[in-house]
Every structure is written in C-alpha cells, then in structure tokens.
Amino acid sequence: MKPTVPFLALALLVQTASAENWPNWRGPNQDGSSSETGLPAKFSTKEGVKWTTDLPGIAASVPVIWGDNIFITAPLKDQKKLVGLCYDKASGKEKWRTTISEADEVQWDDKSNLASPSAATDGERVYFLFANAVAAACDFSGKIIWKRDFKETHGAFATQWTYGSSPTIDSDKLYIQVLQRNETFQFQGKFNKGTEGKDMSSYVLAIDPATGKDIWKHIRPSLAAVESLEAFSSPVFTTYKDQRLMLISGGDTLTIHEAATGKEISRVATWNPPGDGYNKFFRLVPSPVVGDGIAIVCAPKNSPVFALPLDAKGETQPIWQTEPKGVTSDVPTPAFYKGKFYVLDGGKKLLSCLEPKTGKVIWTGELGGKTKFESSPTVADDKVYCVNFWGEVYVAKANSDQFELLSVNEMGNGSKPNGNADSVRASISVSDSSLFIRTQDKLFRVGK
C-alpha cells in the first residue's frame, strides 16, 4: 500500500525530532557534547562519507545545525564579502548565501579571518556576527531581518588578534561578548582597533533577537591590562538551583552572572595578579565549561585549569587547580561528557580526562601527529573527536578509565598549514548520527 501524505509528513516529523540540533558553536549543551549515538570511529574522505560539498572560504566557525539546515560563515576573499550560508543536511547542497558585510578586507592577520565567530540559531532565525562588528539576523530562507554595525553604537572591537567570540542565544536574548583593550590602538600599522570617543570598557550586550535592538549592556570590569584584557571566548549559560547563569572568561578571571540582567554574582580570584611579575600578554581563548555544578576555565599559555563552584558569591578562590606545567589548554575549549571534563592541550597534543569535583586527573594520553590542535574537542557516543591544523581527526575513547586512541582519520586537502589562516580550526559538529567536519575547503557529513 502506498504511504499517504499525512503518513509521510508524520514520518518526516518523527525523523527530524529525533535528531539533536547543534545550535551554537559548542552544541546543544554548550559543553561540546551530544547525546547522538551510532557515530563512526574510523573514516576518511572516501570512507563513511554521506556527502561532501565545496566551501567558498575557510573559517574557524563551526557548522551550526537546526533541523534540515546547516549554517556557516565564510569570507569571500576575492569579492571582499562576508557571507552567511545555509546547506541542506540531507544532501549537502547549498540552499542560499547571504552577504552580510562588504568589507575592505576579510582578513586582518595571518592567523584567521573576519568570519571566525560561529553562527547561532533559535530555530526561528539564524544570527551571524563578524569580527568587523557587523551582525545580522536572517530567516531560514536567507532574508535579512535586521542588520547592525556595532561600530556605530559601541565602537570597533579592540582586540589585537582578530575577534572570534561567537554570539549565543539564551531564552529570549541574543548575547554578544566583547572583552577588549581599554584604549584604541593600531595593529600592524594598518588596522585601527577600537573607536575614538567610544567607551572602550569590556562588556556583554543583550539584544532582542527579533529586532536587533539593545536590551542592556553590562560593563564587565577587570584588573587586567594591555593584551590580557582581550578574550576570544564566548558566553556560556547553565541553570543551577533554579537560577539561570551566564559565565564569562577573560581579563584574567572567570565571572558568573545573572543571565537575565548581566549582574555579576561571583568571580574567581585572578590567576594573573597585578604587580611585579604581571603578564600583560595573557589574552584568553578558551570558553568556560560547566559540569556537575562546577565551572572550569583554562588560564593562558600553559597555565593551570581553575575550577569555581556555581554557587560561589563574590570573589572566590578556586576550589581546585591543576598542577603547574600539568593539564592545560591555551586555545581549545574543554568538553564535558558523562560526568567528566576532557581537556585538550593543543600544543603538546595531549588529551586529559578530569574529575569535576576534585580536579583529579583520571588519565592523560598523547594524540600524536606533527601539527597543533586549535579546534575544541567534541564528545559523543563515548568518543572524543579532535581535529588538527591539517584536518586530521583523532578519535579517542571517552567514558573510560584509561586513555585509548581509536583512530586517526585524514580529512584535509593534503596541504600542511602550520598555524596560518589556512589551518583547520573549526570544531566538529554532531547531529542525526553524523559528524559534520569543516576542513580547509570542504564540508563533510560522515556517518549515517
């Protein structure tokens, strides 16, 4: 008997509902994890690939997924455009591309470009933000609903290296984090950072997703100075004891806020105190991660990992920190999965598993390879997925008492960049029992 139209519609609805979305750069739980199962441990550009599509430009932004849609940002270098794109999840075909900004330059330094921030979606609209401070909301057909240039109202972002914080949707607000220097400066004698006459304080901005208008602006004070004021992390949200919280890392500290108002509740005592020995080059990259009532933050440049309880009040000493020259992460954001933190030291190529309450290191294992990791680990189906500059995906066992490397999978285009803007920095996204892997010039769907 032929299926009826209502039956087919119901089947499609059930299939769509069963697939977990990846609505922002760190996924459905904002911790790099997914509950999806049936994910592959071994694959290549020719093995286990459901589809491959060419991308118009490389960026550190991850594939953001909602239903049948995959959203990414990209620079069009020759056309000097910054675009938002949508691909069909089932086929990989491009549905639309929308120009958000036409810029004089799409790249300001040799490490990244202006499309580094990932998109975010609430299932109704998709939100794009670029490092030149231009943001827009589009509907799912690619039509721009609103567009703003934050330079006009809040000034250009004043970070030495290209701004990379991703927008985050939580409840009824769109959040933009700008942790920046407190004065204007010029980078490489060419690019002006910050805007004269504007307040150069670091801040978090809450925006109405429907209109793009400011709801509130929270100034986020810090004792940091010079480059240590800068952060490339993104806001993280969690609920603890019936209170919705926002976590911000950077400026030599981790702070916890009321999500609804931005009011600061607590902060970890600084890892970089003012005075003799102060390091003014401690820019921060990793975002905070939450698990089992504990928030962790990775201090910069081989410094320890620090932990703060979510119920802390005021300035609080960390409840634990890793040993000096021990577990650390300068760039990748850790993940949380099934009661454990997973911390990737991208420079030394070491993956560690930590117990949240005590910081006990359960295991540390060497991934290997000949180049660094600056993408963040993704954990799902009892596997940890880490991708390096060359597009090599290392798969390790998660939810295990000991380190076990399961496979190394070549997904790059054969080039061997070593930290320049052509290096793979996008973390892996997960949905519908598949991995979505962005490399130098392609997007892969690997799995079912």
Language-model features, listed with the residues they occupy:
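Noncatalytic, solvent-exposed loop/strand surfaces
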Residues: 18-448
